Regions:
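Arg/Lys-rich, alpha-helical DNA-contact motif
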Residues: 2-16, 20, 26-30, 34-97
Length: 97
C-alpha cells in the first residue's frame, strides 16, 4: 500500500471530500482505513485524516474494482497496489530509456 504524507505540492482532502470525489460514503472510506486497506495517519480520528493525490487514485481504483468486477475490498486493494507498482515501474523504465 502507498504510504503518502501531505506535501506542499499535494492536493489534500478530508474524508468527506475524498468520499465525494469517489462517489462513496464517508463510512466506506472509514471502513477501509480501519481495516488497513487505505493507509493514512489515523491520529486524531476521521475528522483529522488527510488524503493526498495517491490516495485519490487508489480509492478510485478500489471503487471501480468493487463496483464493476464485484471484487471484495481486499481484492480491490490488491489490484490498486498492483496498478501503483506498474505505474512506478513504467516511470523507472522511462528514466532508463
Amino acid at each position: 500500500m502507498t504510504n503518502s504524507n501531505p506535501t506542499a505540492e499535494s492536493v489534500v482532502l478530508t474524508v468527506s471530500e475524498l468520499a465525494r470525489a469517489c462517489h462513496v460514503t464517508e463510512a466506506w472510506i472509514i471502513e477501509r482505513v480501519d481495516t488497513g486497506l487505505i493507509d493514512v495517519d489515523t491520529a486524531g480520528g476521521p475528522t483529522r485524516w488527510r488524503f493526498v493525490d495517491t490516495h485519490l487514485s487508489r480509492v478510485r481504483c478500489m471503487v471501480s474494482m468493487e463496483r464493476q468486477m464485484d471484487a471484495n475490498p481486499e481484492l480491490a486493494a490488491l489490484v490498486a497496489d498492483l496498478v501503483e507498482q506498474v505505474r512506478q515501474l513504467r516511470g523507472r523504465l522511462k528514466g532508463i530509456g
